[in-house]
């Protein structure tokens, strides 16, 4: 199911701030965010903070390790320790990661965690570096179960509203899929009994088309997401 949201953008575009605002809306959540660490107004490093409020230094200008990004030395042992605190979750937990970037990707354990989150049935949201890429990141971008959303200073307020709505649509799609009696299939047309009446979806060359207003504006909706997953399960 398309249930993973990746927020990308240039440094200081607001992607981490946006993720932090979104996860505040969820009570049951697992993951971590990365915070700046400053001293006398100067950024000297980054710390990881888990959903439980546990913190550990990820990188610092004064560390001496074999892993370095810009002037920051990365402590892989600290990172792996924090990963062990967020690698287990329940089926209804909301998953989040900030960020999938160069520092974190020094850790093989982090790569395993990313794939575990994305491969789960849980809704997952993560920030993704725009200034760094490697084969692992490019493979993530090619997945067919993600929404890749770019944030800029100009569009972040608009995208915040869109993301909040999209998350509700994904959650609704998951519920629809769990209730197969909602679906009635007739060749290239499908009827879905929704919470607000019946929606008719038609198959076109570019994929499934829905008549709802959200789809007309965004080319995606809970009905299309649900149908794609329903057909995958029942093919």
Residue ranges, per PLM feature:
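P-loop (Walker A) phosphate-binding loop of NTP-binding proteins
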Residues: 10
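N-terminal phosphate/diphosphate-binding loop that engages ATP/GTP or pyrophosphate donors
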Residues: 24-69
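Long, low-complexity, compositionally biased intrinsically disordered regions
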Residues: 165-235
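Short, surface-exposed amphipathic charged segments that create phosphate/polyanion-binding patches used
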Residues: 44-50, 160-169
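Hydrophobic positions on the alpha1 helix immediately C-terminal to the Walker A/P-loop
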Residues: 18, 22
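Conserved glycine(s) of the Walker
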Residues: 14
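Helix-adjacent hinge/juxtasegments
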Residues: 54-93
């Amino acid at each position: 199911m398309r249930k993973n949201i990746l927020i990308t953008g240039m440094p200081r575009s607001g992607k981490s701030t946006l993720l932090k605002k979104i996860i505040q809306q969820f009570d049951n959540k697992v993951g971590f965010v990365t915070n700046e660490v400053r001293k006398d107004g100067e950024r000297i490093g980054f710390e990881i903070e888990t959903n439980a409020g546990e913190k550990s230094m990820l990188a610092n200008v004064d560390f001496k390790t074999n892993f370095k990004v810009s002037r920051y030395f990365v402590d892989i042992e600290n990172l792996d320790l924090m990963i062990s605190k967020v690698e287990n979750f329940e089926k209804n937990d909301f998953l989040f990661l900030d960020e999938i970037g160069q520092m974190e990707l020094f850790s093989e354990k982090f790569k395993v965690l990313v794939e575990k989150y994305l491969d789960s049935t849980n809704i997952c949201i993560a920030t993704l570096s725009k200034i760094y890429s490697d084969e692992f990141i490019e493979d993530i971008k090619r997945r067919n179960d993600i929404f890749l959303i770019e944030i800029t200073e100009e569009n972040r307020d608009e995208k915040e509203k869109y993301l909040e709505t999209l998350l509700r649509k994904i959650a609704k799609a998951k519920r629809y899929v769990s209730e197969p009696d909602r679906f009635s299939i007739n060749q290239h047309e499908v009827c879905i009994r929704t919470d607000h009446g019946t929606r008719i979806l038609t198959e076109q060359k570019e994929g499934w088309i829905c008549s709802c207003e959200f789809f007309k504006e965004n080319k995606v909706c809970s009905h299309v997401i649900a149908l794609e997953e329903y057909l995958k399960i029942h093919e």
